Amino acid sequence: MAKQYETVIGLEVHVELATKTKIFCGCSTAFGGAPNTHTCPVCTGMPGSLPVLNKQVVEYAMGIGLATHCDITRVCKFDRKNYFYPDNPQNYQISQLYQPIARNGYVEITVGDTKKKVRIHEMHMEEDAGKLVHDEWDDTSLVDFNRSGVPLVEIVSEPDMRSSEEVIAYLEKLRTIIQYLGASDCKLLEGSMRADVNLSVREVGTQEFGTRTEMKNLNSFKAIARAIEGERERQIELIEEGKAVIQETRRWDDNKESSHAMRSKEDAQDYRYFPEPDLVPIVIDDEWIEKIKAKQPEFRDEKLERYKKEFDIPQYDAEILTESKHMADIFEETTAICGKPKKVSNWLMVETMRLLKEHGMEPEDISFSPANLAKLIGLTEAGTINSSVAKEVFEQVFEKDVDPESYVEEHGLKTVNDEGALEEVLKEVIAKNPKAIADYKGGKEKALGALVGQTMKAMKGKANPGMVNQKLREMLK
């Protein structure tokens, strides 16, 4: 009988915090600046420069810790992690090992109908390294230190996950929590959220862990899922062939859907950690913790429960709207103005999602105001514009946040409700379409739709489709 294997997965998730300045200096954390323009002696490791801790980093880390049910360490300290690499100018990284900011938390996930708690071992603050830029034509590597010193929180889970589905559910839940806190935008493609996957396999029923590998270069949820499946198969194949799985760090190539070894996987002792001598311990008292708790927002799970009670919208819509705090805020603010939650939900779920997809944008990138969406809904409800014109106007609202009332007025887009003018157009349409008239009178209901379409075209989309339909039926009796 073939052996059955179980996958054991733990994650190290690095989250770039949304502070305006770096963790130990006043340099900007803005993404996309010219190389080496957001630097100073501290973040480039110049001799004699001293770090000064950014308080906002500590408060963001505390917020994430509390939101994931962690115990906040009352006296936390920084440590030096020693290693040599071109993008690490100090030859050490200021991190936390012995007394990190938070420990012993969990995130509850749902896969299918099954709920599960993924435990968090610990969470620590640290500085990011610089970035190596490789020139494939010149065979050289350059270093950009703009990212050096950008604040990170690393969230280390216990090896509680058993499938790629559980991993993605955990990451999505973690991302939503952090985005709701405003602590990070968690964009994988920009590197503000990065996940390293520690994976091993073992025979089903075995308690002892197998030899783990660490997978890096995973910049999308799809890449993470593919890397997990690929590494699982690779390890099982090695075991079946009687070969040893080597403890190592591997780089995933998503184009080739395969990985290659980068280096042997280090343990903590290999980095020769010791206490950071230039930073004093951080003392966290009850008052500070209560202050951070008071700032915690209403999280997604709580919003979902409230939406079920407060707004009469489908469960699926509520789930999509609350995936992004920004989208949920727009929904609630627009609903507060116009009082029509179903209409607001429809505009966000259909037209907004369509335009986001067309423009390659995320919900966090939405820039139109709830007031303008509410005005557009008001125009459609009043019959001032019809649905096709409303979609045209909404594209302008989405792209430029125009005032829909002014736009409709300036471009002459109001629905024509003049029955006399409509009758004149209908007479012309009827005269030009004898076959459609005959088909309709012969019982083909679809023919009426064609006549409505011809009328709407003749009136440049400004007619009321319901009125056109009604008038046509009256005239063709």
Question: Which residues make up each language-model segment?
Answer:
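Basic, nucleic-acid-interacting segments
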Residues: 1-298, 309, 315, 336-340
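Structural motif
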Residues: 3, 312, 335-344, 382-385, ...
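Amphipathic alpha-helical core segments of compact helical bundles
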Residues: 18, 198, 202, 233, ...
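Core structural elements
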Residues: 191-203, 308-330, 341-358, 371-373, ...
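Short, structured loop/turn "capping" segments at alpha-beta junctions
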Residues: 238, 355-359, 386-388, 404
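M16/insulysin-pitrilysin zinc metalloprotease superfamily fold
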Residues: 337-338, 344, 352-367, 375-380, ...
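Strongly charged, low-complexity linkers/loops
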Residues: 363-374, 378, 387-457
